[in-house]
Amino acid sequence: MTFTDVLVVGAGLAGIRTVHCLRDAGHTGSITLLNGENTPPYDRPPLSKDLLTHPEAVLLDEDLALNTPAAATTIAHNTRALTLTAIPVHPQATAHHPPPHPEPRWQVTTTGGECWDAHHVVLATGASAITPPAWESVATLRTLDDAARLRAALTTPAHVAIIGGGWIGIELAAHLHAHGHTITIYEAAPTLLAAQLGAEHGARISTLLPNITIHTSTVITNVTHDHDRTRVTAQPPHGPSWQASYDVVVAALGATPHTELLTTLPEAAPLPPGSPIPANNNGQVTINGQVLPGLHAVGDCATWADPHWGAITPGHWMTALTAPTLLAAAIIASDNNEQPPPIPRPAPHTFSRIGPHHIDVFGVPHQDHTTTTRVYSATSWVTFYHTDDALLTAVLIVNSPRDTAGARKLLAHGPTHVNSASLTDTTVPLKTLRTHP
């Protein structure tokens, strides 16, 4: 077995950012990075936004001006973790007679046959696309290999069905339609983006997708493959089901966090299916209210408990980019027997590009909150999510780049009270809406 101070399991954005944030924070010990793919770490948003126009991988080191091979002590490519085991504390390790290096607290075995002992393990294992078991003929879009297969199926104009009207589904729909393909979207909820924005505002986003057929409140109950066509069975809310065949069918049903490693821990109660790994605001894994020392989770596999925003759900690029700063600081503080420093965390931020349209969401939209919309044009508006006493919890910005900086500043310290009378006034800058500095 081999010792490493920090073992980072997963080499997506959150994983490599953890490596670099540790170095930036002054960590001088060894860092091992396990990359489950053969390809160097790459960016995922371009897979849906630029599938046909950018076939090459957008490597994160190039895109973010990083040098991960220099920052990590060891990188193991095409290597996944198999088991995670807690190591009992060395009985002779005391404050007066510490071991020669940080005491290993976790042991990880891998598909490459290695056995790593680590003082800290960071789970950045990501997530995989959800696909019902019987849908073998359906494409997904989560990895470079997924993108390559889908691109190969779309070399000529095709009729494409996209099952799922979340961010990835509508980004892909707009992109493919712009490149000559005929698109049909099936969504089980009443509108596109209903889970993310609420039905009213998801319906408004749908107006940005002209010439795309959209079936909402419609469940796909069966998918079969017949020669070079794929047939779906659709069940609307009322009336009989129907069938339709397509050249290509893509499932955009969300993602399931990779939490398998926790099943090998006797301390960890089984997580509900599809649930992310629970962590506190510094990324420390927390099971049944108890922090597991030296075990951390970040990125698409984890949900963090934030004191201002509540549970920060996974799946957002900006969260994977920024959260490792707090995690690295917590690791450094732990090694120095100190409390993590108070590091400001930006408001949660989701961004999307739907064809020519740019969308930003700052904060956490609550569907039971009041919404007020400031309209600039038919394709440009800002929606504010707030309580009855004008506590602002989220801002949705559609095609209004001048408002993004203001929204970021407005929510920089968490939900804030605003002047509700000025929300619809297009002449009032967003940054001036706060009523309680």
Model segments located where?
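FAD-binding core/adjacent interface of flavoenzyme oxidoreductases
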Residues: T2-V9, L66-H159, T233-P240, V248-L253, ...
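C-terminal catalytic lobe of FAD-dependent flavoproteins
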Residues: W242-L271, H357-P437
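FAD-site-proximal beta/loop scaffold in flavoenzymes
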Residues: E136-P157, Q243-A320
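Glycine-rich Rossmann-fold phosphate-binding loop(s) that bind the pyrophosphate
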Residues: G10-L13, R142, I163-G166
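Rossmann-like dinucleotide-binding cores of NAD(P)H-dependent redox enzymes
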Residues: H159, L172-N222, P346-T350
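Mid-to-C-terminal Rossmann-like scaffold of FAD/NAD(P)H-dependent oxidoreductases
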Residues: T2-T4, C301-R402
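N-terminal Rossmann-fold NAD(P) dinucleotide-binding loop
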Residues: G15, G169-I170
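Beta1-alpha1 glycine-rich phosphate/pyrophosphate-binding loop at the start
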Residues: T2-T73, H175-L197, G406
